[in-house]
Amino acid sequence: VQALNNANIPVVAVDRSASGGTVDSFIASDNVTGGKQAADALAQSIGDEGEVLVLQGIAGSSASRDRGKGFTDGIATHPNVRVVGQQTANFDRTEGLNVTTNLLQAHPDVKAIFAENDEMALGAIEALGERAGRDIKVIGFDGTEDGLKAVTDGKMAATIGQQPAKLGAQAV
């Protein structure tokens, strides 16, 4: 970004903020509000009571930070829902599978998992096998095609939708 600034080229950031340089315009979903919506959907899916896990995105990224803040703030309004484990899975499906497998060994009685994106949620669903959607609810984020299919198939309780085409159009 700094190189673009030095060349007097306008910079428009879409979906993620820049950590250095100056951005002329920033277009993104409200990830904090989305995180709160995810917390409410998760709590509702488990009858507002139980232990849950959180799969975090890339450490320090604006999306992970904001979605995590929204979820933490939102889940605080549900005192009988407790986050018992959380770990980064870097917005990656395979890491979501592996991290979920490890967290479930330490916390076998969880009722739900919030993943800060659909890719990690889909990895969690793979780790859960037949328990996904039945015994353990999964909430994703992004509203990807695969995520929406998992909701339709009953494997994912919800995904927080984004509209990337609209974000791109606004950026242009």
Task: Give the location of each predicted region.
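A residue-level marker of the well-folded mature domains of exported/periplasmic proteins
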Residues: 1-172
